[in-house]
């Protein structure tokens, strides 16, 4: 099994960590969840804009028009997909004082599982493609995806557990959303494998960079603010950028870049 595929599997499996937290009652504070989302957004923004897009543009045969064009395609593709997906709000379900009715909880959990699963599929593709092209960036993307998969697993498992009273069912439902991400990576591995030209890989990377920027700005940062409105999510974003930037410098200095 390839390292990029293993990274994708681990990132998707992080959903189960959140699911377990959602049923054992040891829920992290909203402040911690919000910071982790901001941290993940910071990692994605730095890798996308400072590493993935420049690397794609430096590829022989990749014109600036095609590179930036694919970046915009990624941005627009994310927002088009976002418009088509059913929307439920995990931040409403993670509030400690929220007490919705049993029926509403179950319906929201179904929509939430479906929506998160559809969102997670391209994240699995992005993790695999990035790691295939540059392993150190793949580690960064996998870490960012894993960090924001934890609150997603928590958001699904909590309401399902409240609606069904079954810990096993709650973890299973949350796991479905994580499996969608793993499925994205596995299908990419089966379809692309190593039979792909550098230019095509660069075009995919540019599009993935656009998706990651849109995901960070449109979903992760606003969600962090809604979960914890009393604190600025920018702190988590800046920390994520700083830690990821420092780690990339250290890896390059050590000869892994």
Swiss-Prot record:
How does the protein associate with the membrane?
Answer: Multi-pass membrane protein
GO CC annotation terms, alphabetical? plasma membrane
Q: Out of the domains of life, which is the source? A: Bacteria
Residue stretches spanning the membrane: 5-25, 32-52, 61-81, 109-129, 137-157, 171-191, 195-215, 236-256
Q: Which reaction does it catalyse?
A: Zn(2+)(in) = Zn(2+)(out)
Establish whether keyword Ion transport is in the entry: yes
Q: Give an example GO molecular function.
A: zinc ion transmembrane transporter activity
Q: What does this protein do?
A: Mediates zinc uptake. May also transport other divalent cations.
Q: What is this protein called?
A: Zinc transporter ZupT
Instruction: Give the organism the record lists.
Output: Enterobacter sp. (strain 638)
Q: Which gene encodes it?
A: zupT
């Amino acid at each position: 099994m390839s390292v990029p595929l293993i990274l994708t599997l681990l990132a998707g499996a992080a959903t189960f960590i959140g699911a377990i937290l959602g049923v054992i009652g040891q829920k992290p504070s909203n402040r911690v969840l919000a910071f982790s989302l901001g941290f993940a957004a910071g990692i994605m923004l730095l890798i996308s804009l400072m590493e993935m897009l420049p690397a794609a543009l430096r590829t022989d045969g990749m014109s600036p028009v095609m590179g930036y064009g694919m970046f915009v395609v990624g941005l627009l593709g994310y927002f088009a997909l976002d418009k088509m997906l059913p929307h439920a709000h995990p931040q409403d379900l993670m509030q400690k004082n929220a007490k919705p009715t049993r029926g509403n909880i179950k319906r929201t959990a179904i929509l939430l599982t479906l929506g998160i699963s559809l969102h997670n599929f391209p994240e699995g593709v992005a993790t695999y493609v990035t790691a295939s092209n540059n392993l150190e960036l793949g580690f960064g993307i996998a870490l960012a995806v894993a960090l924001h998969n934890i609150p997603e697993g928590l958001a699904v498992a909590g309401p399902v557990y409240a609606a069904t009273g079954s810990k096993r069912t709650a973890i299973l439902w949350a796991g479905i959303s994580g499996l969608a991400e793993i499925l994205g990576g596995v299908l990419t591995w089966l379809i692309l494998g190593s039979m792909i030209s550098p230019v095509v890989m660069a075009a995919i990377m540019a599009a993935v960079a656009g998706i990651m920027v849109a995901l960070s700005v449109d979903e992760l940062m606003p969600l962090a603010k809604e979960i914890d409105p009393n604190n600025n999510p920018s702190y988590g974003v800046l920390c994520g950028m700083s830690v990821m930037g420092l780690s990339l410098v250290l890896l390059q200095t050590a000869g892994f870049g």
